[in-house]
Amino acid sequence: MNIFRLAGDMTHLASVLVLLLKIHTIKSCAGVSLKTQELYAIVFATRYLDIFTSFVSLYNTSMKLVFLGSSFSIVWYMKYHKAVHRTYDREQDTFRHWFLVLPCFLLALLIHEKFTFLEVLWTSSLYLEAVAILPQLVLLQRTRNIDNLTGQYIFLLGGYRGLYILNWIYRYFTEPHFVHWITWIAGFVQTLLYADFFYYYFLSWKNNKKLQLPA
């Protein structure tokens, strides 16, 4: 494992911890899209089915369990914890996220590396993760005002994807035959979706102002 992969994993983990801190400690999910969190739960559930069939390392298995457990716990908190659920902005979080799931699965049936059950589900998780942030970004544009923890959560999510791209570049030049076009394209699309948010995030940091997105 290279430093970019490790940094990407730790940044991804940090994003989850920031969100859990907000939900568990402050008892608030204001500004957080339940639709995006449900999509992430599907992403990890379909991607990590191989946890029952293959073992790579203790680190690998531990990270899979952490992301599976955290994604479903976040969804549970937002839907069923009374104090947290009261802060959920249902009226603004109206993106029809389920319409993203089937197209991603159908695309995985058509474009994949190997036509096996686990491989198709794994590929569909790549496509779905690339667009899972869309409901969250739409919600932020509607509400405009973004609290610090929500902003940090999304910034860390985008940072994790950026570090993974550096990981792929590093492995391309250091490992023979390391070519995974599906993973690369999905990751690049996902990173592009964060570009607008990053622009306004750095502007707010530079000017020492509260983060706001244009309507």
UniProtKB/Swiss-Prot annotation:
<keyword id="KW-0256">Endoplasmic reticulum</keyword>
<feature type="transmembrane region" description="Helical">
    <location>
        <begin position="149"/>
        <end position="169"/>
    </location>
</feature>
<feature type="transmembrane region" description="Helical">
    <location>
        <begin position="6"/>
        <end position="26"/>
    </location>
</feature>
<dbReference type="GO" id="GO:0016192">
    <property type="term" value="P:vesicle-mediated transport"/>
</dbReference>
<comment type="function">
    <text>Determines the specificity of the luminal endoplasmic reticulum protein retention system. Required for the retro-transport of calreticulin-3 (CRT3) from the Golgi to the ER. Specifically required for elongation factor Tu receptor (EFR) function in response to the pathogen-associated molecular pattern (PAMP) elf18.</text>
</comment>
<comment type="similarity">
    <text>Belongs to the ERD2 family.</text>
</comment>
<keyword id="KW-0675">Receptor</keyword>
<keyword id="KW-0812">Transmembrane</keyword>
<dbReference type="GO" id="GO:0005794">
    <property type="term" value="C:Golgi apparatus"/>
</dbReference>
<keyword id="KW-0653">Protein transport</keyword>
<feature type="transmembrane region" description="Helical">
    <location>
        <begin position="98"/>
        <end position="118"/>
    </location>
</feature>
<dbReference type="GO" id="GO:0006621">
    <property type="term" value="P:protein retention in ER lumen"/>
</dbReference>
<keyword id="KW-0333">Golgi apparatus</keyword>
<keyword id="KW-0472">Membrane</keyword>
<feature type="transmembrane region" description="Helical">
    <location>
        <begin position="178"/>
        <end position="198"/>
    </location>
</feature>
<dbReference type="GO" id="GO:0046923">
    <property type="term" value="F:ER retention sequence binding"/>
</dbReference>
<keyword id="KW-1133">Transmembrane helix</keyword>
<dbReference type="GO" id="GO:0000139">
    <property type="term" value="C:Golgi membrane"/>
</dbReference>
<feature type="transmembrane region" description="Helical">
    <location>
        <begin position="55"/>
        <end position="77"/>
    </location>
</feature>
<dbReference type="Pfam" id="PF00810">
    <property type="entry name" value="ER_lumen_recept"/>
</dbReference>
<dbReference type="InterPro" id="IPR000133">
    <property type="entry name" value="ER_ret_rcpt"/>
</dbReference>
<protein>
    <recommendedName>
        <fullName>ER lumen protein-retaining receptor B</fullName>
    </recommendedName>
</protein>
<keyword id="KW-0813">Transport</keyword>
<feature type="transmembrane region" description="Helical">
    <location>
        <begin position="120"/>
        <end position="140"/>
    </location>
</feature>
<dbReference type="GO" id="GO:0005789">
    <property type="term" value="C:endoplasmic reticulum membrane"/>
</dbReference>
<keyword id="KW-0931">ER-Golgi transport</keyword>
<dbReference type="GO" id="GO:0015031">
    <property type="term" value="P:protein transport"/>
</dbReference>
